[in-house]
Amino acid sequence: MFSTSDQVSKMNSRILSALLILGIATCVIAGGFCPKSRHPQCDLSYKINDCCAQSDCRVGSVCCVEGCGNVCRAESDTPLGEKFVDGSECKHGHVFPKKWYQFW
C-alpha cells in the first residue's frame, strides 16, 4: 500500500497545482483597465484609431479611447481612463469628420 508520506506528497502537489491555477487565473482577470488619458483633448481635425478591439493590442495592453483616437496602452490596476468597448463602431486608421456637403 501507500505510505503516509506518499499520500502527503500527492496532497501537497494537488494543493500547489490548485494554487498555481488560481494564481494564473487571477493574473489573466486582474488589471485590464486604461490608465489616465495622456491627451484628453485633441487639436487635430481628425482621429487616428490604432485599435478597434481589445484583440488588436498586445498581451498586457488595452485598447483605450483617447482624444485623438483609440490607442493601445499598458494595462492599469485602477480604472482612470476610458476602455474601448468591443463591438462599438470604429474604423482603423485616419478617421475624418463628415465632408462639408454631408452636414445638410
Curated annotation (Swiss-Prot):
Recorded superkingdom: Eukaryota
All residue ranges annotated as the WAP domain in the record: 31-76
This protein's name: U20-lycotoxin-Ls1c
Predominant location: secreted
Tagged with keyword Transmembrane: no
Secretion signal span: 1-30
Cysteine-cysteine disulfides: 34-64, 42-68, 51-63, 52-90, 57-72
GO CC term (a single one): extracellular region
Free-text tissue specificity from the UniProt record: Expressed by the venom gland.
Modification(s) after translation: Contains 5 disulfide bonds.
Compartments in which it is found: Secreted
The family this protein is said to belong to: Belongs to the venom protein 11 family. 02 (wap-2) subfamily.
Key words of the record: Antibiotic, Antimicrobial, Disulfide bond, Secreted, Signal, Toxin
GO molecular function terms noted in the UniProt entry: toxin activity
Biological role: Has antibacterial activity.
GO terms for biological process, alphabetical: defense response to bacterium
